[in-house]
UniProtKB/Swiss-Prot annotation:
Keyword list, A-Z: Cytoplasm, Isomerase, Porphyrin biosynthesis, Pyridoxal phosphate
GO molecular function: glutamate-1-semialdehyde 2,1-aminomutase activity; pyridoxal phosphate binding; transaminase activity
Catalytic activity: (S)-4-amino-5-oxopentanoate = 5-aminolevulinate
CC terms in the record's Gene Ontology section: cytoplasm
Assembly description: Homodimer.
Recorded family membership: Belongs to the class-III pyridoxal-phosphate-dependent aminotransferase family. HemL subfamily.
Record protein name field: Glutamate-1-semialdehyde 2,1-aminomutase
Main location: cytoplasm
Recorded metabolic or biological pathway in which this protein acts: Porphyrin-containing compound metabolism; protoporphyrin-IX biosynthesis; 5-aminolevulinate from L-glutamyl-tRNA(Glu): step 2/2
Higher taxonomy: Bacteria, Pseudomonadati, Pseudomonadota, Gammaproteobacteria, Alteromonadales
E.C. designation(s): 5.4.3.8
Gene Ontology BP terms: protoporphyrinogen IX biosynthetic process
Name of encoding gene: hemL
Cofactor(s) essential for the protein: pyridoxal 5'-phosphate
Disulfide cysteine pairs (residue numbers): none
Amino acid sequence: MTRSEALFEQAKKTIPGGVNSPVRAFNGVGGSPLFIEKADGAYIYDADGKAYIDYVGSWGPMILGHNHPKIREAVLAAVHNGLSFGAPTELEVQMAEKVIAMVPSIEQVRMVSSGTEATMSAIRLARGFTNRDKILKFEGCYHGHADCLLVKAGSGALTLGQPSSPGIPEDFAKHTLTAVYNDLDSVRTLFEQYPIEIACIIIEPVAGNMNCIPPIPGFLEGLRTMCDEFGALLIIDEVMTGFRVSRSGAQGHYGVTPDLTTLGKVIGGGMPVGAFGGRKDVMQFIAPTGPVYQAGTLSGNPIAMSAGLAQMEALCEEGLYEALSAKTKRIAEGFKAAADKHGIPMAINYVGGMFGFFFTEQEQITRFDQVTKCNIEHFRTFYHGMLDEGVYLAPSAYEAGFLSMAHGEEELRLTLEAADRVLARMKAAM
């Protein structure tokens, strides 16, 4: 028994399922999860001391790589001044100014401690501002585990085969309408059915919780048009895509302006941070300037703000996003080339620092229903083959992969050589 396996057995005695977030349990791929002891650059190291090239990156935040010296130094410097004050700090102001400077649609921003808090608060704000109850989301998109959003969700809920979750009253769920991602007709049908009841649309601009599915041309623009037509707010959930797809997020990459934006992951530099922001007239509706209540004991935590600011400043380096996109393209297209070489059907998607691959004969994956038809057994075999080769991918067929600036030529080469060997073994076993 490895030390990771022993720790997993020990953890299950005191922690439900042995993990503090379901996808970490390896239910989507089988076997026991790795327990990680440390990380540096493009690598993570398990409890047995084995190194892995990491394409999870803590599920997105580690865009510069693990243990980046600038972030580490910023955190250590902040710790000397105290861990938490429960009062405003200059760091919060600096972070707000940095976010607003990088994302033109955000005129004011409120810090929170998680992506779930950000989306939950943005939904409440949209409902309060419009005085409407219903929200519109998309099947397979995940916006955290708030009751109103855990309906036909992606991420861990999809991995577990649960389109929603027990514990959510029907009275809550009935206010959540679900449309088909990349299908404007399905959205219009719902707006025509509830023309004055929908407070907002919330969407992942690149769906990263049913693997990786970018928007088709015109889709995000069409949502903007319909929101304007029916008086609803457009919330773009950039918890995953914010500052990863481009310096101004997916909205900047695709040229779409939302009313509200939710952020997380990258802005924390590895610390627990979320945020929501947008039009000033909407944001002024939040307490203490408005009637919609939202609060948080650790919101704007000085240690988290220090880590986030250090990362955000580093992301302003010229040419960084072009280099990150080139790395991502090489991995995604390299996987596809290796699969083609060995006669194993595969489709790929990638944008910015995100990528996805699907074992399927479908040429292009653009919708949730297509994702559910992919070959999960092939994914599981490939996953464990890559793990044995020292490559750590997301342990679910429904999660995007992430590159970092720490992934260099050596890591990319080793990853693609490993993929070639694993796919060759898979073909030989068919």
